[in-house]
Amino acid sequence: MSGLGRLFGKGKKEKGPTPEEAIQKLKETEKILIKKQEFLEQKIQQELQTAKKYGTKNKRAALQALRRKKRFEQQLAQTDGTLSTLEFQREAIENATTNAEVLRTMELAAQSMKKAYQDMDIDKVDELMTDITEQQEVAQQISDAISRPMGFGDDVDEDELLEELEELEQEELAQELLNVGDKEEEPSVKLPSVPSTHLPAGPAPKVDEDEEALKQLAEWVS
């Protein structure tokens, strides 16, 4: 390749990393920055202790410790910002990867559904449902024909059967009434036989005294 081509970037472009590779690289960088945060926090605490140690005894050494502490705090703030940016970028790639996978799945599902219905239309469905309904009706008619009794009972007069049934009911009712009458009839009372010997005569009844007096008076008058 000529130097001019390399200068204007017309050469073959390298293939970029996959989302998975980018996410993995970001995670590794995040781990490095987290370790740097821990290191800077330790240095800040050390310089703070140094400044407290010298205090007013060695003002110059105390000020130098505070200056170093300030620089470490600035580096820590930069590291915090960088780490936040990397985390945001990694989450964005993860979300994009998830969304892309969801879209691919939806596309495959749509293609599969389209393939499943490519030989179908509403007219064919209606025709199929009509055929199914007709076949169900035929099946029902066949079932009815099979279950219908054959060879007897078709020429029997229904009115004649009802009349015969009514006669049987009347006979049964009359028999029930007869049975009730027999149960209600009282059994005859058997009287004792007349004795063959004469009973002794009882004492003669006493004549009323008034009648006797009237009889005597009538005889006296006559």
Swiss-Prot record:
Region (Interaction with phosphoinosides), start-end ranges: 1-116
Compartments, record wording: Cytoplasmic vesicle membrane; Late endosome membrane
Notes concerning its domains: The acidic C-terminus and the basic N-termminus are thought to render the protein in a closed, soluble and inactive conformation through an autoinhibitory intramolecular interaction. The open and active conformation, which enables membrane binding and oligomerization, is achieved by interaction with other cellular binding partners, probably including other ESCRT components.
Residue numbers spanned by region Disordered: 1-21, 180-211
Membrane topology listed for this record: Peripheral membrane protein
Protein name: Charged multivesicular body protein 4a
InterPro entries: Snf7_fam
Residue numbers spanned by region Intramolecular interaction with C-terminus: 1-150
One of the record's GO cellular component terms: amphisome membrane
Tissue-by-tissue expression: Widely expressed. Expressed at higher level in heart, kidney, liver and skeletal muscle. Also expressed in brain, placenta, lung and pancreas.
Effect of substituting residue 217 to A: Abolishes interaction with PDCD6IP
Gene Ontology annotations of biological process type: autophagosome maturation; autophagy; late endosome to lysosome transport; late endosome to vacuole transport via multivesicular body sorting pathway; macroautophagy; membrane fission; membrane invagination; midbody abscission
Keywords linked to the UniProt accession: Coiled coil, Cytoplasmic vesicle, Endosome, Lipid-binding, Membrane, Phosphoprotein, Protein transport, Transport
Coiled coil: 20-105, 155-180
Higher taxonomy: Eukaryota, Metazoa, Chordata, Craniata, Vertebrata
Organism superkingdom: Eukaryota
Summary of the function given for this chain in its UniProt record: Probable core component of the endosomal sorting required for transport complex III (ESCRT-III) which is involved in multivesicular bodies (MVBs) formation and sorting of endosomal cargo proteins into MVBs. MVBs contain intraluminal vesicles (ILVs) that are generated by invagination and scission from the limiting membrane of the endosome and mostly are delivered to lysosomes enabling degradation of membrane proteins, such as stimulated growth factor receptors, lysosomal enzymes and lipids. The MVB pathway appears to require the sequential function of ESCRT-O, -I,-II and -III complexes.
Modified residues (Phosphoserine): 196
Matching Gene3D superfamilies: 6.10.250.1710, ESAT-6-like (1.10.287.1060)
Subunit field text: Probable core component of the endosomal sorting required for transport complex III (ESCRT-III). ESCRT-III components are thought to multimerize to form a flat lattice on the perimeter membrane of the endosome. Several assembly forms of ESCRT-III may exist that interact and act sequentially. Self-associates; overexpression leads to the assembly of filaments that curve and associate to create circular rings. Interacts with CHMP2A. Interacts with CHMP3; the interaction requires the release of CHMP4A autoinhibition. Interacts with CHMP4B. Interacts with CHMP4C. Interacts with CHMP6.
